[in-house]
Structures are given as C-alpha cells and as structure tokens.
A protein has these predicted regions:
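Residue register of alpha-helical TPR repeats
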Residues: 25, 64-68, 107, 147, ...
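Amphipathic alpha-helical segments of tetratricopeptide repeats
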Residues: 12-13, 51-58, 92-98, 130-138, ...
Length: 312
C-alpha cells in the first residue's frame, strides 16, 4: 500500500475513534486533503462534521480550534461561490479568535470583508475592513492596515461614497509608500483619480492619473498601463478635453480586449463614457450606435441597476 493510502486509512481509523479531539483532527486533515484536490464540496462536508463533533464536546471544546474550523468552512464556501454563507462563517471565526486574543482575527476580518464584497453586500464588506483597521496595531501590522484601507476604499466605491473612498485610498497610498510597494501605490493613484472624477475635480484626477501612468510606463507594466490610460481619459473628459479623452479611451479599450480574460464590465463602462462624450459633441447617432452595440453585453455583465443609459 502506498504511503498516501496508508495515511488516509489511518485518518479514517481516527474518524471512528471515540475520542472527540482525535476524530476532529482526522476530519480536518481529510478536509485539507480534499481542498488540496479542489474537492470543496467534500472538504466542506468534513469541516461541518468536525464542527458538529466539536460542538458536542461542550465545555471541553477549544475556542481556538472552533475558530479554525469555522475558517475552514468559510474557505470552502467561498470556493463554492456561496459568498454570503462564507462571510457568516468567517464572521463567527473572527469572534472566536477575538475571544482568545489571537491576531489571526485581523487576517480573517479581511477575508470576511472579501466574502461580503463577493456577495455584493458592500456595506457589510466595508464594515469588516474598518473593524480590521481599528483592531490592528499600526506599529506592527502596517501592511495589513494598508491593505484594509485600500479594500475599504474599494467597497466605498461600490457604495458611491466617493469622498470617504478618497480618504481611504489616500491613507492606503501613504502607507504603501512607506512600504515602497510601487505597484499598489499605482493602483491607489488610479482609484484616487477615479474618486476625483466623480467628485468633479478634473485637475486632481489628472495629477493622480499621471502618477499611475508614470509608474506603468517606467515599470513596463501593461496591466497598470491599461488602467492608467482609462483614468487619464476620464480626467480629460472631466476637464472638457473630449477628443483627447476619446483617443485615450480607444487606447485603453484596445489593451483591455487583448487581455486573456478581458474586463468586460470595465469595457462596457468605458463605452458608456465614449457615448456620453459623443452626445456632448452633438454626435447623437454615433452615441446611440455605441449604446445599441453594448446593450447585449450589459445583460450579461452588469447588474440590473447598472444597465441602461446612465453612466455607472
């Protein structure tokens, strides 16, 4: 018998053990093994059985281990695209880790925020990221705090709270500057520029779009070049420089569609901005044609409240 088969046979023997701790450890290891094979339905079943077994121990159950079990459940549920259920499990994991004063709670708060974001529960997502920021020790967890500021800003963008999003991205950028992480600084500049666009400040939007573009060109980073150009286009549009904006939108779109996995949602939004410029230039037929052409894409990639003529 191969070594792996012997190990699995031993785990199943332990699953049958009358000792609760032994059984739970075996179930968790079987869950890890299944997750490693991307068998998340099976991995989830092992985790849930481990939870039921451990809960039956009552006062003997360790909060630390139960927190770990709930984290495993949340991890599996995220991979099964059950994001809201995953967030609830991760929230429970956070509570249990906090009971024992474990710093793991900070990392899992971020994952909880991610899960709520995936579930399109953006306020709950923001709340989780904010708790992670507030519970962190900025002297020892600067990279964690920086990440949570940026993630919180992203949730706020979805809530269209542009001023608050701007504050979070600005703070995140300052922290990533201290960490000398130029790539994420560029991402922050892109989002800061977007916030300024929606706040109607084209000059400030252009400053940060240019910073993002400078990084992308210098680092020869095609992904950030694509996004920086789209931010430059939005900035120019806000400043009324419509032809320059159209040219930059065209460049950004060409780069987007050449990606192996094109960001269709962003492409649709970009095309809507194009149509809006064409209307401002009194080219109504051309604008209508752009909107007609992307209407079928909207049905596939946009949520109901994002469809139709309004800019998103």
């Amino acid at each position: 018998m191969r070594e792996e088969e012997q190990e699995e046979a031993k785990l199943w023997e332990n699953v049958a053990s009358p000792d609760g701790d032994t059984k739970v450890e075996a179930l968790l290891q079987l869950s890890y093994n299944a997750a490693g094979q991307q068998e998340y339905t099976e991995a989830l079943a092992f985790c849930e059985t481990a939870r039921e077994t451990y809960e039956a121990l009552g006062a003997l159950a360790s909060s630390m281990k139960m927190a770990h079990i709930y984290f495993g459940i949340g991890h599996c549920l995220r991979h099964l695209n059950r994001s809201a259920d995953a967030a609830i499990a991760l929230e429970k994991s956070v509570e249990l880790y906090q009971e024992v004063g474990s710093e793991d709670a900070l990392h899992i708060l971020n994952e909880e925020g991610d899960a709520w974001y995936e579930a399109k529960e953006y306020q709950k997502s923001y709340d989780a990221y904010r708790r992670a920021i507030e519970d962190s020790n900025p002297d020892t967890c600067d990279s964690i705090v920086a990440r949570n500021y940026v993630d919180a800003g992203t949730a706020l963008e979805k809530l269209k709270e542009w001023s608050k999003a701007l504050e979070h991205f600005t703070e995140g950028r300052a922290r990533y500057k201290k960490l000398k992480d130029l790539r994420i600084m560029a991402h922050c500049d892109e989002e800061i520029s977007l916030c300024y666009v929606w706040l109607g400040d084209g000059v400030s939007a252009l400053v940060h779009a240019q910073l993002a573009l400078d990084y992308a060109v210098t680092a020869e980073d095609d992904v950030h070049l694509m996004w920086a150009k789209s931010r430059m286009a939005l900035s120019k549009k806000t400043l009324g420089q419509y032809q320059v904006a159209l040219d930059l939108f065209a460049e950004a779109k060409s780069m987007m569609v050449s990606q192996s996995n094109p960001p269709w949602k962003a492409i649709i939004k970009l095309e809507k901005q194009n149509a809006d410029i064409l209307k401002k230039l009194d080219r109504m037929d051309a604008a209508s044609e752009v909107l007609r052409r992307i209407s079928s894409f909207e049905e596939i990639f946009l949520d109901e409240d994002e469809r139709g003529d309004p800019l998103v």
